[in-house]
A protein has these predicted regions:
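Metal-dependent nuclease catalytic core centered on acidic motifs
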Residues: 1-69, 98-180
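A generic structural signal for short, solvent-exposed coil/turn residues
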Residues: 61, 75-77, 86-88, 143
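A short acidic/basic microdomain associated with nuclease active sites
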Residues: 63-77, 81-82
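Short, solvent-exposed polar/charged micro-motifs at secondary-structure junctions
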Residues: 79-84, 159-162
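Conserved catalytic cores of phosphodiester-cleaving nucleases, focusing on short active-site segments
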Residues: 83-85, 89-98
């Protein structure tokens, strides 16, 4: 199999079942090894990257929600997802966005366009529900290839599929799910 960076770059050329099979092949590569401290988190290195601690915090939260996590390397020459999350036979790629303060999540989401079609938002602070819902809806409107945003907020896991975000009742649904 080609080198890891080439395999990650190939994700941009694939879609549908072919994309899913390729993600699974990447996750099953022998280069992955479990962390000494977390047997459900696999890595191929990258412990020295600037964002490693944020990735690790989100990965541990994903494990709490029943996922096996594959932390992907961050090559400089191509934009790649941060994680492969595995649960119930399904492998999915996610780009991580960690929300710390009151700054606009909208810009951060739009920055992911072209990187990955699914985003994991790890909420570490309170954020205006309506602003977040608007940013999510806008992200799906701008990125026609996007299909899911997964939000971790405390002990809540809130999945938002494209079809839901583009419905008129999305704001009411989101408020109920996010604020409960």
């Amino acid at each position: 199999m080609r080198n890891f960076t080439d395999e990650l770059a190939k994700l941009h050329q694939l879609s549908g079942a072919e994309y899913s099979r390729h993600v699974e092949r990447i996750a099953l590569r022998k280069e992955f090894h479990p962390l000494d401290t977390d047997s459900e988190i696999y890595t191929v290195g990258g412990e020295n990257s600037d964002d490693y601690q944020n990735l690790l915090i989100a990965a541990r939260k994903a494990v709490e929600f029943g996922y096996r996590v594959y932390m992907l390397p961050n090559p400089t020459e191509t934009r790649t997802p941060d994680f492969i999350l595995y649960k119930k036979g399904v492998y999915r790629t996610y780009d991580l966005k960690t929300v710390y303060g009151k700054a606009s999540i909208g810009d951060s989401l739009l920055d992911s366009v072209g990187q990955c079609n699914s985003i994991l938002i790890n909420m570490t602070t309170e954020y205006n529900t309506r602003r977040l819902a608007y940013a999510i809806k806008r992200y799906f409107e701008v990125n026609e290839k996007a299909w899911e945003i997964l939000i971790f907020k405390g002990r809540k896991r809130i999945p938002i599929k494209r079809t839901l975000a583009l419905k008129p009742e999305f704001f009411a649904f989101f408020k109920k799910a996010y604020e409960r």
